[in-house]
Amino acid sequence: IYDKYADKGIKLVCRGMGTTGYGEHLLAKAFRADYHTVETVAHTTGCQKFYPDTTFVLDIGGQDMKAIWLNDGVITNIMLNEACSSGCGSFLENFASNLNIDVKDIAKRAFSSVSPAHLGSRCTVFMNSTIINEQRDGKNPDDIMAGLCRSIIENVFTKVVRVANTKELGEKVVVQGGTFRNRAVLRAIEEYLDMNVTLAPFPGEMGALGAALAAKKHIKEEGYANGESSSFIGFEAVKKFEYTTQSGVRCEHCGNHCLRNVLTF
């Protein structure tokens, strides 16, 4: 975006920077962010920008998922699945690769299925054997992909959310995260819940949007930490940003003496 405007002679000025996600603190240090916030809050903030009446947010990313309940805009409950990726995007990508299906074609192939495989909600290890059994029973790659898209949703509602009645999700269910760019997964959740759900306008970027909005709000209420401008290092500095990595560095801060990767910038 910066280069696009620069080519037209327009200089963009960053009024504030926010970070979130797994690299929240690291990136905040590296690029001198004005504010950082946890993922659940960032995703909720991004969602409420477009849908203030949201009652339930389901974010499915590449490696984890987040389920967030809201009441009058206030978070009332959060459930996470961080230990297992069997209901996430990487899970789907890995099996698509095994079936020689391009990621971009997953939804198309899934919708082409006449008889989706019944795979259930299993971890990756057991899913492999289940898929082999389904293939032996005559299921083709399209059927397997359709079954996997359904399996992701089954995993969410049997392993993470576990609601007795879908009414517990409220009337406004919003889904986001890059996995929902796959329309077959979107269709799977609507079929599973037997209700219409709302797809966020920028599924894979809602957390980033929420972090930006949180930074904007923080600056408006608290002001800048240093002077009257953002502490962000600047777009040109980001383009030239360099760092070094040291692997296998022994940590001496406690008796565990773990091996760490150290990034220096």
Where are the regions that the model predicts?
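Gly/Thr-rich phosphate-binding beta-strand-loop-beta motif of the actin/hexokinase/Hsp70
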Residues: 54-74, 250-264
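N-terminal glycine/serine-rich phosphate-binding loop of ATP-dependent small-molecule kinases
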Residues: 1-37, 187-201, 221-239, 245-249
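Glycine-rich phosphate-binding/hydrolytic loop that grips phosphoryl groups
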Residues: 45, 92-94, 200-233
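Glycine-rich phosphate-binding loops at beta-strand->alpha-helix junctions
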Residues: 20-23, 151, 164-192, 203-207
